[in-house]
Design a protein with these regions (language model features):
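ATP-binding/phosphotransfer module of carbohydrate and carboxylate kinases, centering on a glycine-rich
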Residues: 3-14, 27-37, 59, 74-178
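Conserved hydrophobic/aromatic beta-strand scaffold that supports enzyme active sites
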Residues: 42, 72-74
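Short glycine-aspartate micro-motif
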Residues: 16, 40-44, 50-52, 83, ...
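A gly/ser-rich beta-alpha-beta helix-loop segment of oxidoreductase catalytic cores
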Residues: 33, 47, 55
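Structural signature of FAD isoalloxazine-binding scaffolds in flavoprotein oxidoreductases
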Residues: 66-69
Length: 178
């Protein structure tokens, strides 16, 4: 019904409704780094972690149009809680939300152990002010605790990417988001 209503507002032009990661995967396959690739995967990083899979030029959606929920593959059994209700999902570690939580944990551990971190000053001692940029900014300034955060984040991201490559064997894998 939404597509039809939008189409009517746009003088009958065709309107398609698509999940953001699938739309990004289509865009990469149509005009981006995956142009001409038979098999490609797009990983979208943001508040969550999404995925779009292109097989033979078409988006893979699964039987219920919910295929490619890559962020909800488990990479840490019994790990961090995820917004989906499960534990250990890739999204809980490699999304911006996951990065914020990893950063908060490292700051809390630094407090307990007496380690100094410039991230404390950046957030004014208020963990609710941690952002996805906090650790990267502090790491660039030479903060060791922040470097540990970034290493952990990248390790989980790489683990998930390796899983995607091993499962799908894409010609092209792209990562984007906002």
């Amino acid at each position: 019904p939404i597509a039809a209503k939008l189409s009517a507002l746009l003088d009958g032009k065709k309107v398609y409704i698509e999940n953001d990661a699938n739309a990004a995967a289509k865009a990469e396959a149509f005009a981006g780094v995956a142009k001409g690739a038979k098999y490609s995967v797009m990983i979208t990083l943001g508040t969550g972690l999404g995925g779009g899979i292109i097989i033979d030029g078409k988006v893979y959606s699964g039987f219920n149009f919910a295929g490619a929920e890559l962020g909800h593959t488990v990479i840490e059994k019994g790990g961090r809680p995820c917004t989906c209700g499960r534990h250990g999902c890739w999204e809980a570690y490699s999304s911006a939300t996951g990065l914020v939580n990893i950063t908060k944990d490292h700051i809390a551990q630094a407090r307990k152990s007496g380690r100094k971190t410039s991230m404390e000053e950046m957030i004014g001692g208020d963990l609710s002010k941690v952002s996805a940029r906090t650790a990267f900014t502090a790491m660039k300034a030479g903060d060791e605790v922040a470097a540990e955060v970034v290493d952990e984040y990248i390790s989980y991201l790489a683990c998930g990417v390796a899983n995607v490559i091993n499962i799908f064997q894409p010609n092209v894998l792209s990562i984007g988001g906002g």
